Structure formats: C-alpha cells, structure tokens
Amino acid sequence: MSSQTVLVTGGAGYIGSHTVLQLLLGGFKAVVVDNLDNSSETAIHRVKELAGKFAGNLSFHKLDLRDRDALEKIFSSTKFDSVIHFAGLKAVGESVQKPLLYYDNNLIGTIVLFEVMAAHGCKKLVFSSSATVYGLPKEVPCTEEFPLSAANPYGRTKLIIEEICRDIYRAEQEWKIILLRYFNPVGAHPSGYIGEDPRGIPNNLMPFVQQVAVGRRPALTVFGNDYTTSDGTGVRDYIHVVDLADGHIAALRKLNDPKIGCEVYNLGTGKGTSVLEMVKAFEQASGKKIPLVMAGRRPGDAEVVYASTNKAERELNWKAKYGIDEMCRDQWNWASKNPYGYGGSEDSSN
C-alpha cells in the first residue's frame, strides 16, 4: 500500500503542494507535473525540504497536459497506481472574460490525461472538483445529491469533467474515480513554508485579507453587506488546506475499495462563516486591523453555501479537524514569513 506511486497534476499549486507533502509523509511516491502558469517551482523545493527523509520520493516535470508526447513519456517511464488531477485554470472572473482559454486548458488537458491514463492501464483517479458545481443552491447544507449547475465557465469546466468521469465509468467499469467537491480552501501548512501565492489579483477572500495585512493593499473590498445573514455578508464553508490535503489521502485509500465506481464527496467543515467573521478571526490571529470598503453584491454570488460532510465522514473516514482560528493563524504565519509569496519581493505583486 505505502509504496504506491501517484501522478499529481498541478502539484505545484496551492492545494496540490499541500497534498503532495501529505502524500510523501504518508509513504507514497509522488510525480508532479505542472506547467507553472499559476504556481511556482519554489513550492516543490520547499515541499522536499518539509518532507525530510521522504524527499527522494518526489520528482517534478514541467509540462502542460495538452502536450500528449511529453505526458506519454512520463507514463512510459513510470508505472502509476493512481492519479490526482488538480491542474487547471481557476479564476472565476477571468473565466467569464476568457471562456475559450478555460475550455481549452481545463477540458483538453483533462481529455489528453484520461486518454494517456487509459492507454497505460492506469484507471484510478481522484479529481478535484468544486462546490461551484452546485451553482446558487436553494438550501443548505449542500449534499452530494443536489442538482448541478454552474454560474460561470470555470464552474462549467468542473461540471463537464465530472460528467466525463461518470461517462467513462459507465463505459468501462474497471475505472475507479472519486470526485472531490471542495468548498473554500484557506490557511497554510503550519510551518509557514508553503501556502497560497496567487498571481495577479486574488480570486478568494483570504489572499486579499493577507495582502492588506502585510501592506500590499490599502483595504479589503467586501462585496455585499445586505444579505439576509447574521451580519449581512456572504457565508461560506472555509476549510483548512491541510484538512483538504488529508481528504485526498483518504480518497486515494478509498480507491482500493472493490465497491468503488465513480463516487462524489464534499470536502468542507459543514459550518458556514461570514466574511466579517473571517476578517475578525484574521485580525485576532495577526494583531492587524483590516480596513474595509463596502461594495455592492457581485452578480452570481450565492448568499450562503456550506457543505453536508456526512458522506465523507461515513465513507472516507475523514473529518476536518481545524477551525477558523487555526486557519487564520496558519494563514498569517505564511503571510508574515512570505509577504510577497514565493517571489520574495515586491515585483511579484500585481
């Protein structure tokens, strides 16, 4: 079990790098492929340092999944037990402006990956999907049985890939596929050595908050303070990235269950936290005041979204351990040690 070799696409990214570290510490061998479009090879070097005696079980190849020949070479030289597929563009706003870029990158890259996997007899897959596939849910908590819809091209790429996975399994039952729908990943490894380092303008709340805290931005813009929530701001299910990484290890182990076909699991905490509650927790963790600018709601933003985690707890034997105080503590630890992310200087900030 412990000497399994796993291909991790997008393994230099935020969630990918944290998952690769947990894989190595769990005794797995990891081969990372990443085109470094929205990530840094520094993350891979730091994962190796954190992995200590397991560092030799990690190798990295810079490649784009759409490059079939390069991917073929990797599969020809290594026998993979399974694949964790993170790679993809993930900025909701950018996907609305550049839909073809998202369909090309996310869908074609995935199809090439699946074809090469099939050609080499590797049919175990963990796919990183997203709670965006629930669209604007009419009620909460979101269960895995909720109707699926997507409000933007990014979400649609996730939804289409989920459908491709279900179709592949229906066509060939020897595939074993787990789709993980993440909610809102935040935090960083407790060492403060790896974390989220978005290129350009962040897409998510916490990188914005941390950039205000370290002086890279003057204030945090809060989109919508007239929702029917406790303080008027949107409510989301924030999950610590280390919990999320552990969820992937649990999913990999579940692929060995002979009863698994194509299964879906939510990965969240099952608790909703408002934007203002999250900001307050970060202020307490960092000792910094976060100035706020109130703005109107963004079109397509849901009011309240949080996960039902019962299925993952029951079938994966996985449950999130960390609360928002630990998430903010670790986010600040990373931000204060790496105010400009992996770039290390102001010119990496846009």
Swiss-Prot record:
UniProt binding sites for substrate: S130
Transmembrane segments: none
Short name of one Pfam family: GDP_Man_Dehyd
Reactions catalysed according to its record: UDP-alpha-D-glucose = UDP-alpha-D-galactose
Catalytic residues identified in the record: Y154
Binding locations of NAD(+): 5-36
Domain of life the protein comes from: Eukaryota
Broad class of enzyme this protein falls into: isomerase
Cofactor(s) recorded in Swiss-Prot or TrEMBL: NAD(+)
Keyword list, A-Z: Carbohydrate metabolism, Galactose metabolism, Isomerase, NAD
EC number: 5.1.3.2
Gene Ontology MF terms: UDP-glucose 4-epimerase activity
InterPro entries for the chain: NAD(P)-bd_dom, NAD(P)-bd_dom_sf, UDP_G4E
GO cellular component, one term: cytosol
Keyword NAD: yes
Keyword Signal appears in the UniProt entry: no
Pathway of action: Carbohydrate metabolism; galactose metabolism
Gene Ontology BP term (one): galactose metabolic process
Record family assignment: Belongs to the NAD(P)-dependent epimerase/dehydratase family.
Stated name of the protein: UDP-glucose 4-epimerase GEPI48
